[in-house]
């Protein structure tokens, strides 16, 4: 089997504008980040699978149901599909941060490893885009060598990323220069 490269995206703070300390609990509260459509289309054009990996402990806290989260993701996918930018896979960990026995919570590589197995992905030729240390650490733990950190207010950057951006507005431009070099 020939493995495909992929770009893994965190959701809140990367795909959509961060809700700050809160949660995106409804589709009306979900607002795409500037430049994300162009970035996703570019990944696809260059032959990279696009996969969403997101921690959504709002479900674990009882602030929303799994059904509501699924509906938000379905609406997101519909909007992305209209832009030829839909994700090929969505992986969400709904465990609480302190939940004992959770294997999917970032920085665990579980969501990435599951996506790689289910979609035939080459992690050595892949990239992670995230805004938290745990996103970058998850990529390192999964063996993904290339990472892009989107700097967002209030998220200290202590785990080194290979590239750091001030916002998603320049993500497509950055991906255009990086992706051809990691295949």
Model-inferred region functions:
Residues 2-3, 7, 66-67, 71-88, ...:
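Asp-based, Mg2+/Mn2+-dependent phosphohydrolase catalytic module
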Residues 14, 57, 133:
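Short glycine-rich anion-binding loops that position phosphate/pyrophosphate groups of nucleotides
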């Amino acid at each position: 089997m020939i493995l495909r490269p992929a770009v893994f995206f965190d959701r809140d703070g990367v795909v959509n504008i961060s809700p700050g300390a809160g949660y995106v609990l409804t589709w009306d509260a979900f607002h795409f980040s500037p430049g994300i459509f162009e970035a996703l289309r570019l990944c696809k054009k260059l032959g990279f699978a696009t996969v969403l990996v997101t921690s959504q402990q709002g479900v674990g806290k009882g602030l929303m149901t799994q059904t509501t989260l699924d509906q938000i993701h379905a609406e997101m996918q519909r909007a992305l599909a209209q832009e030829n930018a839909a994700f090929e896979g969505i992986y969400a960990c709904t465990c609480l941060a302190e939940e004992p026995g959770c294997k999917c919570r970032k920085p665990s590589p579980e969501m990435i490893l599951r996506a790689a197995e289910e979609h035939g992905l080459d992690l050595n030729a892949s990239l992670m885009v995230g805004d938290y240390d745990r996103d970058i650490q998850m990529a390192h733990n999964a063996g993904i060598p290339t990472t892009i950190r989107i700097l967002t207010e209030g998220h200290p950057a202590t785990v080194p990323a290979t590239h750091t951006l001030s916002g998603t507005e320049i993500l497509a431009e950055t991906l255009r220069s990086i992706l051809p070099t990691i295949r």
